């Protein structure tokens, strides 16, 4: 069993959302599983927020962040500051490469990046990264079949990260 969350659903009250999740998980001895930074935007900072709340609530090693896509939309210096926080929080990252690869195009101009968790930076930075799938044969991804080999292959090609020794 886990306690799951989606802070973006409580826009403007994300801290309260995370406080409730962490408190419920701590009281019940559960792990925490939170979907963060899904919109591929430099306006999102939920991964950082989750890492800080993990430390604040003493939940190190018990929290997984799913997606973390928007990290790629931030400057490298900020990303590495967040990686340091993730390590301090002993937080796990779950990348779901095909979940947002079709992110809608916008007219917003920014540094070039794709809508994939920056696994190619996280793994060498010493962050524990796993793969998952986020939508199985549903309205959003009708052809997704939960094949983790597909998820791995998409990440490999999208991030140009082929260091197999560090991926196993």
Task: Please place each PLM-identified region on the residue numbering.
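Short, basic, glycine/proline-bearing loop/turn elements
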Residues: 67-69, 97-106
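Histidine/acidic residue-rich metal-binding segments in metalloenzymes
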Residues: 1-64, 70-93, 109-131
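His/Asp/Glu-enriched, well-ordered alpha-helical/loop segment
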Residues: 52-63, 99, 103, 114-168
């Amino acid at each position: 069993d886990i306690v799951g969350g989606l802070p973006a659903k409580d826009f403007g009250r994300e801290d309260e959302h995370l406080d409730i999740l962490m408190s419920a998980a701590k009281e019940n001895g559960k792990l925490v599983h939170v979907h963060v930074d899904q919109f591929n935007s430099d306006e999102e900072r939920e991964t950082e927020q989750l890492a800080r709340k993990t430390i604040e609530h003493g939940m190190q090693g018990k929290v997984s962040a799913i997606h973390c896509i928007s990290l790629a939309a931030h400057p490298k210096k900020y990303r590495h500051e967040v990686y340091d926080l993730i390590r301090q929080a002993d937080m796990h990252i779950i990348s779901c490469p095909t979940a947002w690869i079709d992110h809608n195009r916008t007219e917003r101009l920014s540094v070039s990046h794709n809508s994939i968790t920056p696994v190619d930076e996280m793994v060498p930075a010493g962050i524990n990264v796993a793969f998952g799938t986020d939508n199985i044969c549903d309205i959003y991804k009708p052809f997704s079949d939960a094949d983790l080999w597909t998820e791995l292959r998409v990440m490999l090609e999208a991030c140009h990260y082929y260091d197999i020794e560090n991926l196993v």
